[in-house]
Design a protein with these regions (language model features):
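Conserved N-terminal beta1-alpha1 strand-loop-helix module at the mouth
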Residues: 5-181
Length: 181
């Protein structure tokens, strides 16, 4: 019985983020299912949108859903503008951003930062936990690609972390329950 309680507690801590909203129909769908977060991709990608489109979608979005801006090596001013305009609640840095970059960003914004880690080893994840960010996002490493590969990684590499994290990479309706345990 105690083990079931622990599992229930862990699952209740699980939050859902759907990334890559690009069309009004996508916003209608997430409004129906009410994930905790949605991601607007501002980085070069097939799912890329602009700031004005994000603001338009934000107005359509159920107020219970928080928005995440997905950026790769973006100018600090671009991120500051998206935050100031109210387009995004959280900033997801998915590139090669350094500690210094994140420190400078925190001088400009108060929004929480999610730092993506393209997982190669357990040591790398433990080192990333020291970064000046609110959350980590653990994603699959694919050479030359910053994310969105659709492939998973070995979840046994994930150590016990104190910092909350998002799990990405190859998640599907068929495997999501297995991956959040």
């Amino acid at each position: 019985m105690a083990d079931h309680w622990k599992e229930t507690e862990r699952i209740s801590m699980t939050k859902i983020k759907i990334c890559g909203l690009k069309r009004p129909e996508d916003v209608e769908m997430v409004n129906e299912f009410l994930p905790d977060y949605v991601g607007f991709v501002f980085a070069r990608s097939s799912r890329q949108i602009g700031g004005e489109q994000a603001i338009y979608f934000r107005k359509m979005l159920d107020s219970r859903i928080q928005t995440v801006g997905v950026l790769v090596n973006a100018d600090l001013e671009e991120i500051e503008a998206l935050c100031s305009a109210g387009a995004i609640d959280l900033v997801q840095l998915h590139g090669d951003e350094t500690v210094e970059y994140m420190d400078k960003l925190y001088e400009k914004i108060s929004n929480p930062i999610i730092k993506a880690v393209r997982v190669r080893s357990q040591e790398q994840i433990l080192e990333a936990e020291k970064l000046p960010c609110s959350y980590l996002l653990l994603d699959t490493y694919c050479k030359g690609v910053y994310g969105g590969s659709g492939t998973g990684f070995d979840k046994s590499l994930i150590p016990v972390l104190e910092k909350p994290y998002f799990l990405a990479g190859g998640l599907s309706a068929e495997n999501v329950c297995e991956n959040i345990r």
